From Swiss-Prot:
Function: May act as an adapter to facilitate the interaction of SnRK1 complex with effector proteins, conferring tissue- and stimulus-type specific differences in the SnRK1 regulation pathway.
The protein, known as: FCS-Like Zinc finger 17
Segments forming FLZ-type zinc fingers: 41-85
Entry GO terms, CC: cytoplasm; cytosol; nucleus
Subcellular location: Nucleus; Cytoplasm
Keywords: Cytoplasm, Metal-binding, Nucleus, Zinc, Zinc-finger
Length: 126
């Protein structure tokens, strides 16, 4: 019967041995004398209202690297982005409809506009 070891195992070797399968590279350093202004200001101000962000207060993040001073600012930016996406998809849908419209009846166009109206109702803030 063969003995099989499972788990972590400490392997020691003499460091004076030259192993052909080991490559040692130093890390790369980018020598940039002028960093972007966005790099210098990362999480310094709210992305929406430009209020200064403080280290002792909560920062509300959105899409990975956008910081906001409050939930309201973050949610407003989310609504703005959703509206932009809706407008872009609406334009694409209308362009597609116009290309594919081969004498289609009024009922199809009415269904399309009713669908768009319903989608826009989702973004109306009371």
């Amino acid at each position: 019967m063969t003995k099989i070891s499972v788990g972590l195992q400490l392997v020691t070797r003499d460091s004076r041995e030259k192993l052909n399968n080991i490559v040692i590279k130093s890390s790369l350093r980018l020598n940039r004398s002028n960093p972007n202004i966005s790099e210098l200001c990362f999480l310094k101000t709210c992305h929406l209202c430009n209020k200064q962000l403080h280290q002792d207060k909560d920062v509300y993040m959105y899409r990975g690297d956008l910081g906001f001073c409050s939930r309201e600012c973050r949610e407003s930016q989310m609504l703005i982005d959703d509206r932009k996406e809706l407008e872009a998809s609406t334009k694409m849908m209308l362009a597609s409809y116009r290309r594919c419209n081969n004498g289609a009846g009024k009922s199809e166009s009415r269904n399309l506009f009713d669908d768009l109206r319903r989608r826009r109702q989702l973004f109306i803030v009371p």
